[in-house]
Amino acid sequence: MAQKVINLLFVFLCVTAVSAQQPSQPPRRSMQELVRMPVVYRLPGMDRVVVKSNLKYVPTGEPHQLMDVYVPPGLAKSERRPAVLFIHGSVPPGSPAKDMGVFQSWGRLAAVSNMIGITFTHRLSFPKPMLNEAAGDLNAAISYLRANADDLNIDKDRICVVVFSGGGPLLSVAMRDKPAYVRCLVAFYAFLDIQQSEPHRANESAETLKSFSPIAYLASETAPLFIARAGLDGVPTLNDSIDRFVREAMAKNASIIVANHPRGLHAFDIQNDDERSREIIEAALTFMRMQLGERKQ
């Protein structure tokens, strides 16, 4: 299990090890350290969050397609809270991405912010993206949450979708049909237009590239967006995709907030232990609470 978690970092953190050698940047870390690293922002009560682990959100499929649900401490059985669904990026097949420190801590942050944090492992992979399969997993995860909302303390009509890194294309699943229960969308250092990405172009048709580019679904009625950008992100074409997305969002008069970390590396929420990282993480949590109609505890 530990080795699988280490392997999955190849895509998620492929450029940070190089970038970290630059002056004034975080020190170079081993893969084992990066696997365990939590988000650089903490809130009181994170250690008291109730975690429902390894739920099978699909009736069949790979054994690693599991979900963890993070519930606020002290929440009564009858109480309901909005759900925040955290979507990981591309990983080698069989890697339990939900078990990485970054997603475990984001789940806890959501829970102590009076929301239900959801992390799950899906089939978005490397080197072949398997976008259609991953989209099916995302739809299955949402269906599972809504069908089991009462048992999971979830308000099924208040959901936020959060994507990271190579998981950006899956934002298109929520944007395409614009379901009323998806109240807001968040993207952290994520691909938002894969039509210019060489790895994606090498494996997918032009039709699929457009279908899984969130930029194609921008409109004035798009759910409110929060975009976090790493200024020193070294993943080829990633920041270009964000910049194109932001320009198009403005042109379409969409509701959007953009938070840029000028010194931020890819995965700055674990790599850059500085005030700007914490400001952006706090702002993202505030955005989620506001859009989901939750007050801070």
What are these regions (language model features)?
Residues 184, 190, 195-251:
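The feature captures the conserved acid-bearing segment of alpha/beta-hydrolase catalytic domains
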Residues 87, 188, 261-264:
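Alpha/beta-hydrolase
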Residues 140-210, 214:
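Primarily recognizes the serine-hydrolase "nucleophile elbow" in alpha/beta-hydrolase
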Residues 87-89, 229-230:
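The conserved beta1-alpha1 loop
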Residues 98-102, 106, 118-156, 273-277:
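Catalytic nucleophile-loop/oxyanion-hole region of alpha/beta-hydrolase
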Residues 75-81, 89-129, 194, 235:
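Short substrate-entry loop that stabilizes the transition state in hydrolases
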Residues 25-79:
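N-terminal cap/lid segment of alpha/beta-hydrolase-fold proteins
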